């Protein structure tokens, strides 16, 4: 049984959204940076006795695309909100900008928070000027809880560490939300509540 699903990936420019999507869907890591306006990818993901036909939408994080970006949010089942583990400003923008935009434009949609470029934090990034500026796992977990994310995952597109876990978490969050909504509808508003809290994979 195929289940269609739409997940939109958002976050500041240059945090690694496109690299994450390309590596996951094509096993290819891009060598040159090019700002994305909008793009989408598709992949089939097994989920229990079902196969999720996962449509992944890549968006531009730059401010000049702010008025167009929400057009991609229409009928989204969930979101992956990404920040760069070596860039504290990108982490700060999660709560200052991104979660506010998602809650305003897509209220109720589940959000998976993702810290990208894990390889730079783990692989001696101090010589690149990152050093202690890197975001620690506990900080990302705390941020995930603060914004009400379904899960917090740290990954590297380059090494593919935890890369699959990002999209597995997104699919799981969306499927659980659908099931909770279905039960709620069946019981005329008295149905089950979704799982609370924020899981973490780092």
Question: In which residue ranges do the predicted regions lie?
Answer:
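Polybasic, Ser/Thr-rich amphipathic helices
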Residues: 186-202
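TRAFAC-class small GTPase G-domain
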Residues: 1-181, 202
């Amino acid at each position: 049984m195929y289940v269609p699903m739409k997940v939109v990936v958002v976050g500041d420019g240059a945090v690694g959204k496109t690299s994450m999507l390309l590596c996951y869907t094509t096993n290819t890591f891009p060598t040159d940076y090019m700002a994305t306006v909008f793009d989408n990818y598709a992949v089939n993901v097994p989920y229990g006795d079902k196969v999720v036909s996962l449509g992944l939408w890549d968006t531009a994080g730059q401010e000049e695309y702010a008025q167009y970006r929400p057009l991609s949010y229409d009928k989204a089942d969930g979101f992956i909100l990404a920040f760069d583990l070596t860039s504290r400003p990108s982490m700060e923008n999660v709560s200052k900008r991104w979660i506010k935009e998602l809650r305003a434009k897509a209220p109720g949609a589940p959000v998976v928070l993702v810290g990208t470029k894990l390889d730079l934090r783990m692989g001696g990034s101090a010589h690149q000027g990152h050093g202690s500026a890197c975001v620690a796992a506990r900080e990302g977990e705390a941020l995930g809880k603060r914004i009400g994310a379904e899960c917090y995952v740290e990954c590297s597109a380059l090494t593919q560490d935890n890369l699959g876990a990002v999209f597995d978490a997104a699919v799981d969050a969306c499927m659980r939300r659908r099931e909770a909504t279905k039960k709620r509808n069946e019981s005329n508003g008295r149905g089950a509540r979704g799982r609370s809290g924020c899981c973490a994979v780092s």
